[in-house]
């Protein structure tokens, strides 16, 4: 059976490509983004009361991962990219309907002249232009489960790199983007299958290409170039 689902909004973020996007929402809370509604959904009444919630659920599409067919198993980056798990036991973008689910923090609601009412959020893990299908409020009494188990993610742990971002290069970024850039780099933006020591990688972020190398647990930024 096929169903039709409409795009209600798109995410405006600092990521022009999927490279380097945090693998989960809220890993880098300094990241800022804006939800811009499609013209037919720019009705302020549809957002009445939303300012009373601190967090929102975003249902969206992995638009860069759409492909024909699907695989019942995938390789989660958190397991090094070598171990296969069932697709429905992971948050992999390579799934039957390519749907993503993210919880973001609502920073504010703004009425604009050109784009109607927009939502400013933080902690989003979405590429610029990502299609959004629905928005729902996060309800603490129903959505929070302190005793929840995290499956294989409980044992994988959270590993952060030490980031050496020289002051002269960091100064090339807008002041409001610096903390977010360091946060993104600390989570090792490299794909799990492309981690060669000494190789120079480029992270497109906030209008710049941030080039870096990684040796063991240390990431060093070597160049910042405007895109």
Report the location of each language-model feature.
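Mixed-charge, low-complexity intrinsically disordered regions
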Residues: 1-99, 111-120, 124-227
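Conserved positions in beta-strands of structured domains
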Residues: 12, 104-107
